[in-house]
Swiss-Prot record:
The encoding gene: infB
Family: Belongs to the TRAFAC class translation factor GTPase superfamily. Classic translation factor GTPase family. IF-2 subfamily.
UniProt-annotated stretches for the region Disordered: 88-305
Protein name as catalogued: Translation initiation factor IF-2
PANTHER family: TR-TYPE G DOMAIN-CONTAINING PROTEIN (PTHR43381:SF5), TRANSLATION INITIATION FACTOR IF-2-RELATED (PTHR43381)
Stretches with biased composition (Basic residues): 254-269
This protein's UniProt keywords: Cytoplasm, GTP-binding, Initiation factor, Nucleotide-binding, Protein biosynthesis
Region (G2): 425-429
Coiled coil: none
Amino acid sequence: MTDLTLKALAAERQVSVDRLVQQFADAGIRKSADDSVSAQEKQTLLAHLNREAVSGPDKLTLQRKTRSTLNIPGTGGKSKSVQIEVRKKRTFVKRDPQEAERLAAEEQAQREAEEQARREAEEQAKREAQQKAEREAAEQAKREAAEKAKREAAEKDKVSNQQTDDMTKTAQAEKARRENEAAELKRKAEEEARRKLEEEARRVAEEARRMAEENKWTATPEPVEDTSDYHVTTSQHARQAEDENDREVEGGRGRGRNAKAARPAKKGKHAESKADREEARAAVRGGKGGKRKGSSLQQGFQKPAQAVNRDVVIGETITVGELANKMAVKGSQVIKAMMKLGAMVTINQVIDQETAQLVAEEMGHKVILRRENELEEAVMSDRDTGAAAEPRAPVVTIMGHVDHGKTSLLDYIRSTKVASGEAGGITQHIGAYHVETDNGMITFLDTPGHAAFTSMRARGAQATDIVVLVVAADDGVMPQTIEAIQHAKAAGVPVVVAVNKIDKPEADPDRVKNELSQYGILPEEWGGESQFVHVSAKAGTGIDELLDAILLQAEVLELKAVRKGMASGAVIESFLDKGRGPVATVLVREGTLHKGDIVLCGFEYGRVRAMRNELGQEVLEAGPSIPVEILGLSGVPAAGDEVTVVRDEKKAREVALYRQGKFREVKLARQQKSKLENMFANMTEGEVHEVNIVLKADVQGSVEAISDSLLKLSTDEVKVKIIGSGVGGITETDATLAAASNAILVGFNVRADASARKVIEFESLDLRYYSVIYNLIDEVKAAMSGMLSPELKQQIIGLAEVRDVFKSPKFGAIAGCMVTEGTIKRHNPIRVLRDNVVIYEGELESLRRFKDDVNEVRNGMECGIGVKNYNDVRVGDMIEVFEIIEIQRTIA
């Protein structure tokens, strides 16, 4: 082998020359860039690198590269594109467990030693401060008592001298008597002075004792758990007690300086060192300078004797940092408290109200929960709904399995042809109609029966009073029939069963009754509560009996609603019309909806600019149980949202914006954060193929149903990802999104506009139009099946029995065989079986018949077989020849 130069070896290994030189030096080989490297030196370097890899710590390096395009505007209105590449690299190192335990033990020992030293220093300072405070208090009491006694004695002497002068001016006859009175007065005055002196001394001693107790209480820190917030040390308390007398002597003279001293002192040892420097300078100056000792800067903050409990006001959501500010503690303490509760958070993470309440109460604070929807409640309560309730028409939902004749039954009742207008003859929207009969008005909701429209059927059951369950007499109970029964039971509404297609020869209504009885739907003649009516939507049989049964059930329910006042209702369906804007189909429940009313509908609001009934006719008002289409909303509301008429458009806008913000905050608060464990789990899963789809449909319910159906198709190998979805035609924005994400554009009953078609043609995007949900789901299944890896299957094509063994100088042992089954083909994989046990698996190398090489030998013929790299062939062995075929898998 030709020796490589070190520079060529570095290029081959994709490392720098300097690093390779260093690696050779570490391995004990001195090389330069131009030296040649022999094979022995390569082996030495490889052994050295393997030793380092084994002895070094386990490392995992993750590299990520992201490319994007930035458009920069230039001169002349032109813009240029700049390619931006962001590279990220992270390395995770696994520590040695023994080293980690040793470091943890050293840190624990150091913390315990520091804690012990701190406790001893605090106790020593506390004892010294207490003794000094008691001495100062006793000396002060003695000085005050002595000074007061001297003053009172001087006053008594002065009074005695005045009395003596007066005696000399009076008559000599009264002198003796007055001397006796003066002596008596002097004795009483001395007793009174002594009594007052004793009382004063007792009072001063009591005051000194009380001051000593206060100083002792102040200097002793309470065993509060978190004391690091206040940064007040015991030495500062001792200095404060030492200078207390000096501050009292200074009085008003030092007030100005004390005001400056009340500023917050610096924390930690810097504050102590500054105070020590001030005292040292005062001691060096001496004389008058010493008097300024009492005005040195002191910490003006008094440490609370116990933890301060606050009233913490918490809204719907709050960040960890805001919660810490409300409790006047550090954010790290809140994070520590949440870690004890089992939640790992950051200081900027949003948490919900329940979590914040739990943390605040755990830290000893009182929680006040703030209702952020006060404006919404005020707007909802300010409605005119005080009128009396009147009887209203029932709302009836037609439910059942697909193709059981729900829409055809409703067609006959309405005497129109609605089913022919639906694509594929199946209902894909909720239709709302009201019908005038001889006995009164009935409002019908026609729901889809296809399996994809589960949420639509659930909404129909929630908005209804009576459910008409349509079951085909020739088909019986089907999966969507069972689901409709469950929706009706969940909504708590009565069920009227319409057994349809009774005119068919194979109709069996008794079978329908037996099957429905298994799910709790019993006919009245069997002692149940459900009415069974035999109808035929084609011939019109039993339609009048069905309407009578519906009205009878409505009379039993005694349905009433307020007809006068501000209306409220529910959105049955919504879509975006190109000419009219957002359109919502609303079923009025209470009150009367007028043209021009201000409505609040979920995240949207607006003024009703126009109303149309199900026939497309303009109407000015709609009462209870009447379905109408309204125009004028700010956006397309979600199907199922509550519609409420309010007084003030400005307040309606504020409530709608608040709901949007609240929805976003709650979504962010509950969003799961990706953890390191999940990252490693995703790495082990391997590559998962994704089918990206941008979905646009004509109504909100179809978007919801198609999205749910497509997401349910996902498997472990291929996943469906809805990149974007919405109501309305395919726009240029949708096409750009599909191009950026390599997605399929799917339009359900909508088309692409001119600008979108240009982008689609330029980017060669895959655009597909559908009008039936069956076809859409089937084609997405086919696209997903193409991404599945094929299944490999082994198929046995021939079996030969070894009758004799020959030796060949070229191929070794040659088995003389008789083909007993199938065909033996050359160069196919084989298995050698001995006593029906596989002992070798390899390849058929040589196949001969009468010394001629052949490609295959059929059943019943003799041949010679040479097995590649195998010579242990014995008489009686079986040689099994098979081939591997690929089977294309499909999504079930």
